[in-house]
């Protein structure tokens, strides 16, 4: 197996044992990108010169036995809505084409402190609005398992690059499923941490009460290792939580005998296809075989998650994206003759169709006369959804179900049908609305397209999610299939 498919844990071991130099790892990754990414189209920008320079500096530290950092010499890819100082950050939008940040995001500072090596920026749905990575202004990423299928979204580039062996880990952002859904479609592991667990400073805002940064990897333990490096309270983000326990790996490998797991009947109901239901039922049998107690429960407000989410997220987006006016930064229309025209033309030309749709929806929901009927009512529904989870977690440790109602759909199949596209978020949006942690791991395949299993945990209990996900992974994984993609 090529180095490109090795895990974060294995690469770290090889580097620390001096079996390989960081520069050799990074070169192998760029060779893989050159060979594979013209087809996959996961990267928007590469930072090869700086990456090789840093890797060679790490070679020198390796020679001196000064290998500090949990991710020493490990290559990484970063979703293009996470600010990277000195490297173009576009959010896959014409609006930010050519924008080079002059400061660093908190997560990037943390990863640099761990001596990880930035390979490049990854494709996404424009401003993280979409579920297929087809709304990107620049290119359409494909699914490494089936090039006629979407990789999911909005972190489609982040998921595809990891599945294709182009980076051992990546970061994405999850507002309504944007890490977990592409992880499910691409057969990898994706974690949306508890809201506030990871600083959002330097994440270009979509919906500020929902957005969270998280890792995507090819196995569960790697995911826990990466998450440990990026969590923590941040003075630059007032919503970051002062939680002391940032250890996610110590329970990995412990059995799950006696663990109580809830399976909501709504998660296997209308809209979920038969192959997905069968894969989840098989997964439940595996969990029971490991000694877990799985029981059916009800989360009665699940069906209201999508309408509630799209009102709240679009309302927050209409506010957050008002800063892109063509004056201070962002696309500047050359056709405008007046200030009013400058605002209108810069935004209408700079934003894509889906972004404009959500800005319009959010502006309408917040407008006088409709605020109570839409936005306020959606916030009440959000409270009911959170209370549903609270009731279940009084008696259960974890909730399990499918990540998505179906496997990956075909490229071009749903891009012009927004309601069908939004329906794919049925099982992921409630987790964001409740601010809970959720992880997606592979649990099956149909017609070569992976199916994802989602575990949902109590607030700030990512450790338990990793424990149960790891135990399941030992019985079912796609590790040997990645190299055949």
Curated annotation (Swiss-Prot):
GO molecular function: ATP binding; glutaminyl-tRNA synthase (glutamine-hydrolyzing) activity
Active-site residues, Swiss-Prot/TrEMBL: 79, 154, 178
EC assignment: 6.3.5.7
Keyword Nucleotide-binding: yes
Enzyme class, broadest EC rank: ligase
Catalytic activity: L-glutamyl-tRNA(Gln) + L-glutamine + ATP + H2O = L-glutaminyl-tRNA(Gln) + L-glutamate + ADP + phosphate + H(+)
InterPro entries the UniProt entry points to: Amidase (IPR000120), Amidase_CS (IPR020556), Amidase_dom (IPR023631), AS_sf (IPR036928), GatA (IPR004412)
Sorted UniProt keywords: ATP-binding, Ligase, Nucleotide-binding, Protein biosynthesis
Pfam family, one: Amidase
PROSITE patterns reported for this sequence: AMIDASES
Single GO biological process annotation from the record: translation
GO cellular component: glutamyl-tRNA(Gln) amidotransferase complex
HAMAP family per UniProt: GatA
Role summary: Allows the formation of correctly charged Gln-tRNA(Gln) through the transamidation of misacylated Glu-tRNA(Gln) in organisms which lack glutaminyl-tRNA synthetase. The reaction takes place in the presence of glutamine and ATP through an activated gamma-phospho-Glu-tRNA(Gln).
UniProt record similarity statement: Belongs to the amidase family. GatA subfamily.
Subunit structure as annotated in this protein's UniProt entry: Heterotrimer of A, B and C subunits.
Protein name: Glutamyl-tRNA(Gln) amidotransferase subunit A
The species this protein was found in: Staphylococcus carnosus (strain TM300)
Gene name of this polypeptide: gatA
